[in-house]
Design a protein with these regions (language model features):
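Short, well-ordered beta-strand segments enriched in hydrophobic/aromatic residues
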Residues: 460, 487-495, 628-636
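Aromatic-rich peripheral "rim/lid" segments of glycoside hydrolase catalytic domains that contact
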Residues: 371-375, 385, 396-403, 407-471, ...
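Surface-exposed, glycine/proline- and aromatic-rich loop segments on solvent-exposed faces
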Residues: 471-588, 650-674
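Active-site-adjacent substrate/metal-binding segments within catalytic domains
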Residues: 37-130
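C-terminal motif of bacterial Sec signal peptides marking the signal peptidase cleavage site
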Residues: 16-19
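Active-site groove signature of glycoside hydrolases
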Residues: 144, 152-156, 171-239, 260-272
Length: 712
């Protein structure tokens, strides 16, 4: 009996394993077009080849049968909350857990941008040894991004960029084949990579999102001729930059073929800014000034694995995605405006090789960096919206005949900066804190949240608040306060019925006013912010006009808006709304129309519940009111606090002449109503040398899990 059971188990495992890449049973519900599911045998010319890129898709060598495999995966960043790119230091155990979760999400591919920690490859090897359905890897190869700006030319006289690129190519190939003990990685001088994972590698992607100016500078080398290599060659139309890429790709294929008798599909990264199309209604010249056309790079018969194209494609930027008429007017099969799908269809016509969307993502940050004409914004989305919108974008990708779609990203990373937030990074990454207003920090399917656990669930209940956190106990109110790395939390308990607005003044740097002329309230300390609570209307955080970074940056410094000189005067008694900038002025050439600069009120608070276990959970909300109890979580960034563990705040920019930083030891907070002279109480900020965090799977995870079942 035991023997029969064992045989049945083995047979079941074999069946499951084969089904990972077979396409014999494509159901009616499958998202992907039912075509080109297999190809004839591949002439491997004595090489080890597990994947080929051919026609529209990738094909996997399943015991000499070449079955189509749709690449559905996630981009994995290098870091966790308190590590940085120089020393990512993610553990083996964490990688093992992530691979399991990714596989259970019904994804089959992990994409990385560059060489990873040795523990990544060890965990990848160990996971795949035991997995019924091994994960595939898309390995990125880049060079120091600073070269894009410091050198600014791929064909510089000293060959700085080319040498760095070649070195990374060689190191990466050796690592993939488990033959490297010479690569410096973070704090590891000689990192050891000893597992050959090449059979799981579906492709290499060379390069970065190329700045237009970098490409133009390279193309100025008009004496650079087309490149003709052993495996790749340029067409006669190739630009100097495309010649450079061709050479780098040829060196990769040559090194791997000659050193390891292995060939793997290769692509060159591109993005919408340098795509091969012209976008006549793009308002910003630098977003449509130069093209990188990898169709000017061809493979010869010696390269059997095949080239593919890889592009990062987002729905909200560049602006032509919102304003190109033929894209906005396009209706998908559901009758919905779908500029993303229209662009995908337009783009794919440019290629004779399989095309992969190397990045597509939507952040659940509180802050918004760009707005989409159909609501697929860069930020400000709920986790449910993230999941639903991503499935819509992926459907457009797969239905349009793309070979794969890689979600950006698996985990949130706290080091990332966004163009419309004040940039700050502590010297010691171990005390880094999150900025929930930064869209770049909110893309992950894995939420990386402040604190060892969630210290306060905004739900209008006081069971999480202790007497030690009660800072004011008056005849009318109880005010509680606590904080973690991401937020200042407040709870208010009303002891009697209050019909009017309630005000909570907050002093951080202490450069604000001691009165509010509009609301008829005064304070015993200079107050930088006022939390204006309206139980029956809008609740918002206001800033003293003098301490408004929005007005200082976009009015006083950049002149985007007319500036009120009264805002540069201390103790004016003027408190203004907190705004977030999302777009400069735009002139649309096709429409002959100018759109004014765009911004929104980021200090307007949203009502809801932040308990992930509640069916009413909403990650974008700020406060909740239940009878006479109110709870708030205020992002530190809205208070100009850049790092709560160090008490780092934005300094007095008018006095300093620029945005810089200083440290404070305490906050001061009070509570009152119109006509009051409010007494402020001190809250000490305790210095921490090690920030804490916890992780959880966002609500989007389950949505994607159900969706990806249908992608075969």
């Amino acid at each position: 009996m035991k023997k029969i059971v064992s045989i049945m188990l083995i047979f079941a495992m074999m069946t499951v394993t084969v089904s990972c890449s077979k396409n014999d049973n494509i159901s009616e519900k499958n998202i992907v077009p039912d075509k080109e599911t297999t190809i004839e045998s591949v002439d491997m010319d004595g090489n080890n080849i597990e994947f080929v890129a051919q026609g529209d898709y990738f094909y996997h060598n399943d015991n000499k049968k070449w079955n189509r495999v749709i690449l559905k995966g996630v981009n994995m960043g290098l870091t966790l909350a308190t590590t940085n790119l120089n020393n990512p230091d993610v553990s083996y155990e964490t990688y093992m857990e992530w691979f399991k979760q990714i596989s259970e999400m019904n994804a089959n591919t992990v994409k990385v941008f560059t060489i990873m920690n040795p523990d990544f490859y060890q965990a990848f090897y160990d996971y795949n040894k035991k997995a019924e359905c091994p994960l595939y890897l898309i390995q990125g190869i880049w060079f120091n991004e600073d070269y894009l700006y410091d050198v600014a030319d791929a064909l510089d006289a000293d060959n700085i960029v080319a040498d760095a690129f070649e070195r990374n190519i060689t190191e990466t190939i050796d690592i993939i084949h488990g033959n490297s003990d010479y690569t410096s990685y973070g704090n590891i001088k000689n990192a050891v990579y000893h597992n050959d994972i090449s059979k799981y590698v579906a492709g290499y992607i060379l390069g970065l999102e190329w700045p237009a100016e970098f490409v133009q500078n390279t193309n100025s080398h008009t004496d650079r001729e087309a490149y003709f290599g052993e495996y790749l060659e340029n067409t006669n139309d190739a630009t100097p930059f495309e010649s450079f890429l061709c050479e780098m790709g040829d060196k990769l294929i040559s090194y791997e073929t000659q050193s390891y008798k292995t060939q793997i599909p290769v692509a060159f990264l591109n993005w919408q800014t340098t795509d091969a199309l012209k976008h006549s209604n793009e308002p910003f010249e630098e977003e449509d000034s130069v093209s990188v056309n990898t169709e000017n790079i061809k493979s010869n018969e010696s390269y059997k694995a095949g080239l593919f194209a890889a592009l990062d494609i987002y729905p909200y930027y560049p602006e032509f995605m919102n304003h190109q008429k033929e894209y906005v007017d396009y209706k998908d099969s559901n009758g919905q405006s779908n500029p993303y799908e229209a662009y995908l269809i337009d783009l794919k016509k440019e290629y004779t090789v399989p095309v992969m969307v190397a990045e597509v993502g939507l952040p659940t940050s509180r802050g918004i960096a760009h707005e989409s004409v159909v609501g697929y914004n860069q930020g400000g989305l709920t986790e449910k919206q993230q999941g639903e919108y991503l499935t819509n974008l992926l459907t457009s990708i797969y239905k349009s005949g793309y070979a794969g779609g890689m979600i950006f990203s698996w985990q949130e990373e706290w080091f990332k900066q966004t163009w419309n937030t004040v940039k700050y990074a502590p010297e010691n990454p171990e005390c880094r804190t999150p900025n929930v207003m930064s869209a770049e920090q909110g893309y992950g399917i894995v939420a990386v949240e402040p604190g060892e656990n969630q210290i306060c669930k905004i739900d209008g209940k006081l069971d999480e608040w202790s007497d030690s956190e009660n800072i004011i106990d008056s005849d009318e109110y109880k005010l509680y306060s606590k904080y973690d790395e991401g937020y200042l939390y407040l709870a208010v308990q009303l002891k009697s019925k209050t019909d009017g607005k309630i005000y909570v003044p907050i002093s951080t740097l202490g450069v604000g006013s001691q009165k509010d002329n509009t609301r008829n309230i005064a304070f015993d300390k200079n107050t930088d912010y006022i939390l204006e609570i309206d139980k029956n209307g809008e609740t918002r955080l206001l800033t003293d006009a003098y301490y408004s970074t929005f007005h200082y940056i976009y009015g006083y410094s950049k002149g985007v808006f007319d500036f009120d000189n009264d805002y540069s005067v201390k103790n004016s008694g003027e408190y203004v709304r907190i705004q977030m900038f999302t777009s400069n002025e735009m002139y649309l050439p096709d429409d002959n129309k100018t759109i004014e600069p765009q911004f929104y009120e980021s200090g307007l608070l949203k009502l809801g519940i932040t308990d992930p276990d509640s069916d009413k959970f909403d990650n974008t909300v700020d406060y909740y009111i239940a009878d006479n109890t109110m709870e708030f979580r205020i992002p530190w960034y809205l208070l100009n606090v850049m790092n709560s563990t160090q008490g780092t705040v934005i300094n007095d920019f008018y006095s300093e002449g620029s945005i810089n930083f200083t440290n404070i030891k305490e906050l001061n907070i009070g509570i009152g109503k119109a006509g009051d002279n409010i007494e402020m109480k001190s809250i000490p900020l305790e210095e921490k040398q090690q920030s804490s965090y916890h992780t959880r799977l966002k609500k989007s995870y389950e949505i994607l899990k159900e969706y990806l079942k249908k992608v075969k």
